[in-house]
Design a protein with these regions (language model features):
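Conserved beta-sheet core of the metallophosphoesterase superfamily
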Residues: 3-4, 8-20, 95-165
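Short acidic-hydrophobic, aromatic-tinged amphipathic segments that line or gate anion-handling sites
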Residues: 24-26
Length: 165
């Protein structure tokens, strides 16, 4: 569906234009919003595909792929690998490990909604290529369905957090 939409440039990056006020940020693009550089790199595998129906509740192209990473690395190189904000669906591997350690150190079981997401996926392995080179001030993700903040990393679920950088 998204691939059928027209592609245009908006705020310095390529987007799919959905309507006059709604845009889909293409994976791997860097945008300048409010004077801040933002890398958009959404996508993740559904961990519960067996309960979903293809083309209705899950899609094969929902996961990050090699071309998304190539696009991100190419766009990052144009800004010396520096952005203010990274927006992803899946968290970087380092942050995911820290969240799990935090639950363990508190004597809590890892929440059931995180359990299926513990194994590294193909998207997470690909994302490591970006993790190695990008320099950023804050990184936001939402896949773990928990509200947690550790250093420069944010996992958001219910919270809305203003970007103050």
């Amino acid at each position: 569906m998204l691939k059928a939409l027209p592609i245009t440039e908006y705020l310095g990056g390529r987007v799919h234009k959905i309507s006059d006020k709604i845009y889909h940020l293409i994976r791997g693009e860097v945008f300048e919003i409010g004077g801040k550089k933002i890398l958009a790199l959404g996508g993740a595998e559904s961990h519960d595909k067996e309960y979903r129906e293809e083309h209705k509740t899950w899609w094969r192209d929902e996961a990050i792929c090699n071309s998304d990473i190539r696009n991100a690395l190419s766009n990052l190189s144009k800004c010396d690998n520096k952005v203010d904000v990274v927006l992803t669906h899946i968290p970087p591997s380092k942050f995911k490990k820290q969240i799990i350690q935090e639950f363990t150190q508190c004597g809590e079981d890892t929440p059931l909604y995180i359990e299926p997401k513990l194994a590294n996926t193909a998207s997470e392995e690909l994302l490591k290529q970006v993790e190695k080179v990008v320099r950023f001030k804050c990184w936001f993700s939402g896949h773990l369905h928990t509200d947690t903040h550790i250093g420069k990393y944010y996992s958001l679920y219910d919270y809305v957090v203003p970007i103050k950088i």
